From Swiss-Prot:
Pfam families: Ribosomal_L9_C, Ribosomal_L9_N. GO terms for cellular component: ribonucleoprotein complex; ribosome. The gene is rplI. The lineage of its organism: Bacteria, Bacillati, Cyanobacteriota, Cyanophyceae, Synechococcales. Belongs to the bacterial ribosomal protein bL9 family. One of its GO terms (molecular function) is structural constituent of ribosome. This is Large ribosomal subunit protein bL9.
Length: 152
């Protein structure tokens, strides 16, 4: 049986690991795929030092993103309520529904900060009223806002 080779991954590879992980692979896989395609590097002290430096930078970056998300969550709570105007029938039922795009637009108008509509979790909204909406700002930070749907 052939000896396995240790490599440091330069990018996430689904079946192996994440960027910066030290993995053991078959020599042929390393020689024929990972090394020629630039997806990994052989383990050396210099490479390990680079990996540690990159991990420290990544950690700082993640902390900054989390702080930014927490600050935005506080701003959303300070505003309190966001209003979306929709056309309503005689019985109070909306023509159509309130989408995450509508909510993202209302948040952008109030905060002047762009938000990805895919991070917004909207309950079924088919009538005027007040609703709770979840927004995932960061993988560790979720904000809950009050949404008011009114007719125009």
């Amino acid at each position: 049986m052939a000896k396995r080779v240790q490599l440091v991954l330069k990018e996430d590879i689904l079946s192996l690991g994440k960027d910066g992980d030290v993995v053991e692979v078959a020599p042929g896989y390393a020689r024929n795929f990972l090394l020629p395609h630039g997806k990994a590097l052989p383990v050396t002290p210099a490479v390990m030092k680079q990996v540690e430096h990159r991990r420290a930078k990544q950690k700082e970056h993640e902390a900054a993103l989390k702080d930014e998300a927490l600050a935005f969550e506080t701003a959303l709570k300070t505003i309190g309520r966001f209003t979306v105007k929709k056309q309503v029938g005689d019985d109070g039922v909306l023509f159509g529904t309130v989408t995450n795009g509508d909510i993202a637009e209302a948040i952008e108008k109030a905060t002047e900060k762009e938000i990805d509509r895919r991070t917004i979790s909207v309950p079924e909204v088919h009538a005027i009223g007040q609703y709770k909406v979840q927004i995932k700002l960061h993988h560790e930070v979720t904000a809950e806002i009050n949404l008011e749907v009114v007719s125009y």
